[in-house]
């Protein structure tokens, strides 16, 4: 099912059958050699967060010592933060050394040498980037951050229970020995209602791995230029924010407030209760009411200045390049360039002038408890890519960042009818329904599900035996979109885009479509043949090109079959917001355009992320859709409601999302006993 789900969309970029075969052979290797490589990769990373064996001996003579100079700048006990630019030079050097290895065996030998010299987390990040981007490792499974650092995702009480059992030497054969399904409900903190979302293992792992697929430190000298990387930064984080808003509204909470003033107290406190057992690093608690403070080399005023420069360039239409020239951002590439500026990645037009707004805000927020290092306090979760999305402040900050992108989008003209409708074909959406597996038409049920996370043997807290941890997450029933489309011309290929958004705002009022578009979540994107006359298209929720399967999160990675997966994508069990017991009305929107008009022409030489192409793009791959991400809801809409805005190739339906409150056991739960 997983391979079929993306074939329809991935095929957009494949020009001829021979090319398709070549790419598949390159990216989807299942032979014995690839299995050997995967075992070697897993062997390298397996010891990153574990004590090094006293018998280990690093290879000698595989790399000149002078090439290793400068490595080890970041101390081993510290957290590696991709947000902290001070780490970028060392991380970039490690990535380059790993990519420059002449063949796979040399790559493994170089990795064995480097991992002893550098910070463990920095090595894991650089090694993962290299595995994803080397030609001789594409298509292989990349180690998942939660497999290597489960203590970044499991709270201290769970880790301590694992440690107690391990110290007793008890052996349990595939039994979930630790129950971590308790979700707190602290009525003193409204955000505790969102713990199931904020602290979800798959969500936070996705955020980390997305930054592996699209590294801020990537430059064209390392390989092919990343296609639409800046736009992906905008769109993926915009979608994380929109999904967070839907979860808040499902729980009767107002949308999150935008971060606005650097001198205002932050009302939301956050206590992560996570620490790294091997090093003792404990993520700092942020009490409510704290105010962001200057760092020794980074005053808040610098952040304000960078933001003003970006906004001035947006409103004036003139951007300053590092070579001293000025230029206007065009409609097609403007959002991509702006994304690189705001992130700010090494491909920013002018990092000296526009600075590093997004990343350094994470650093300032992460060091709020001890900005000068006076008390030796560890940083908070906002400092770490793997943990930052746990904090409600993450979404307030990204709403601020998203507003900058919307300032740019608001300078673009609304789409015309001609731009919204196919020019060489006539499609009419005549009806849409959503059919749940067990519920009434246009109703989708959600519930809790337990899943088993394997914690491997050899950690400080699992020295003697592996363990299973039972975790609790949201889940929804399978459902099918049924879309009736009339094609009034010859046989064509339709390009389907599906979005969803809450029907009412937090006051119970119908949205102005221009406000509703800002919280649209992308549900799916795919192509389908449309024959003359009426066509009934059925699309299953499991096939979404937005999501990665829960098996990619919870299954033993060594047992997964490599299908060119990037382990990137939104967790499939979070595709639908929680909803509520009464029924949370969501509007599902569909637009059908002509694939021939939207496809990207030209050969491609890389691999796509087959598990979630829409959110993650590809490795060395052109994104196979020339339309802006979020089309047709990415630009301002002057009409008041959807009915006034829509064209004949669009439609919508209201769907009730009902939370049942039930809890479903893992599919293989009984097999563990």
Swiss-Prot record:
The leader peptide range reads: 1-20
Compartments where found: Secreted, Extracellular space
Task: Tell me the tissue specificity.
Answer: Hemolymph.
Q: Name one GO cellular component term.
A: extracellular region
InterPro entries, alphabetized: Di-copper_centre_dom_sf (IPR008922), Hemocyanin/hexamerin (IPR013788), Hemocyanin/hexamerin_mid_dom (IPR000896), Hemocyanin_C (IPR005203), Hemocyanin_C_sf (IPR037020), Hemocyanin_N (IPR005204), Hemocyanin_N_sf (IPR036697), Ig_E-set (IPR014756)
Q: Where does Cu cation B bind?
A: 358, 362, 398
Disulfide bridge map: 568-616
Q: Which residues are Cu cation A-binding?
A: 207, 211, 237
Name one molecular function that GO assigns to this entry.
Answer: oxidoreductase activity
Show the stretches that span the lipid bilayer.
none
Which residues are modified by glycosylation? 323
Q: Can you state the subunit structure given in the record?
A: 36-chain polymer consisting of 6 hexamers, each of which includes 4 different chains, A, B, C and D.
The family line of this record is: Belongs to the tyrosinase family. Hemocyanin subfamily.
Q: What's the protein here called?
A: Hemocyanin subunit C
Name of the encoding gene? HCC
């Amino acid at each position: 099912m997983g391979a079929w789900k993306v074939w329809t969309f991935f095929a957009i970029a494949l020009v001829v059958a021979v090319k398709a075969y070549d790419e598949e052979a390159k990216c989807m290797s299942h032979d014995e050699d690839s299995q050997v490589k995967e075992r070697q990769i897993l062997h390298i990373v397996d010891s990153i967060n574990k004590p090094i064996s006293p018998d280990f001996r690093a290879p000698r003579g595989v790399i000149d010592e002078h090439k290793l100079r400068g490595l080890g700048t970041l101390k081993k006990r510290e957290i590696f933060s991709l947000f902290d630019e001070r780490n970028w030079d060392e991380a970039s050097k490690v990535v380059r050394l790993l990519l420059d290895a002449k063949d796979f065996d040399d790559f493994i030998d170089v990795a064995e040498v480097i991992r002893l010299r550098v910070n463990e987390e920095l090595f894991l990040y650089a090694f993962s980037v290299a595995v994803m981007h080397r030609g001789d490792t594409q298509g292989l499974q990349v180690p998942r951050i939660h497999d290597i650092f489960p203590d970044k995702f499991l709270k201290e009480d769970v880790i301590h229970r694992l440690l107690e059992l391990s110290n007793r030497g008890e052996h349990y054969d595939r039994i979930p020995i630790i129950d971590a399904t308790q979700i707190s409900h602290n009525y003193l903190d409204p955000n505790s209602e969102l713990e199931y979302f904020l602290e979800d293992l798959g969500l936070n792992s996705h955020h980390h791995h997305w930054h592996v697929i699209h590294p801020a430190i990537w430059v064209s000298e390392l390989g092919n230029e990343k296609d639409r990387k800046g736009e992906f930064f905008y769109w993926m984080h915009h979608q994380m924010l929109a999904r967070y808003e839907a979860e808040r509204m499902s729980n009767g909470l107002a949308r999150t407030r935008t971060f606005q003033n650097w001198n205002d107290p932050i009302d939301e406190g956050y206590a992560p209760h996570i620490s790294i057992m091997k090093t003792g690093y404990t993520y700092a608690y942020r009490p409510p009411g704290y105010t962001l403070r200057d760092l020794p080399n980074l005053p808040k005023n610098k952040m304000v200045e960078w933001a003003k420069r970006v906004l001035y360039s947006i409103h004036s239409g003139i951007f300053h390049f590092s070579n001293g020239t000025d230029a206007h951002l065009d409609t097609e590439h403007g959002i991509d360039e702006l994304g690189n500026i705001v992130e700010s990645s090494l491909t920013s037009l002018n990092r000296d002038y526009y600075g590093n707004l997004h990343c350094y805000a994470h650093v300032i927020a992460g060091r709020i408890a001890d900005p000068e290092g006076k008390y030796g306090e560890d940083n908070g979760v906002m400092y770490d890519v793997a943990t930052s999305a746990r904090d409600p402040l993450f979404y307030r900050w990204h709403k601020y960042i998203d507003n900058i992108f919307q300032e740019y989008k608001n300078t673009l003209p609304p789409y015309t009818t001609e731009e919204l409708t196919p020019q060489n074909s006539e499609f009419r959406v005549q009806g849409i329904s959503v059919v749940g597996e067990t519920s009434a038409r246009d109703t989708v049920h959600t519930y809790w599900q337990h899943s088993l996370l394997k914690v491997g043997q050899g950690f400080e807290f699992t020295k003697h035996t592996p363990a299973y941890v039972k975790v609790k997450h949201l889940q929804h029933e399978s459902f099918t979109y049924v879309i009736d489309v009339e094609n009034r011309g010859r046989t064509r290929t339709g390009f389907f885009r599906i979005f969803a958004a809450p029907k009412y705002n937090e006051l119970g009022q119908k949205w102005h479509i221009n406000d509703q578009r800002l919280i649209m979540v992308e549900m799916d994107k795919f192509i389908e043949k449309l024959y003359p006359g009426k066509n009934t298209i059925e699309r299953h929720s499991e096939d979404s090109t937005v999501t990665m399967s829960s098996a990619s999160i919870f299954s033993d990675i060594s047992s997964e079959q490599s299908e060119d997966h990037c382990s990137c994508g939104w967790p499939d069990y979070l595709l639908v917001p929680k909803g509520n017991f009464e029924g949370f009305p969501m509007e599902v929107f569909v637009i059908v355009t002509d694939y021939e008009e939207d496809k990207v022409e030209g050969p491609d030489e890389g691999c796509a992320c087959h598990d979630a192409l829409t959110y993650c793009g590809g490795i060395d791959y052109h994104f196979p859709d020339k339309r802006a991400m979020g089309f047709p809801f990415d630009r301002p809409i002057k009409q008041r409601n959807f009915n006034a805005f829509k064209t004949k190739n669009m439609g919508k339906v209201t769907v009730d999302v009902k939370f049942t409150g039930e809890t479903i056991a893992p599919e293989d739960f009984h097999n563990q006993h």
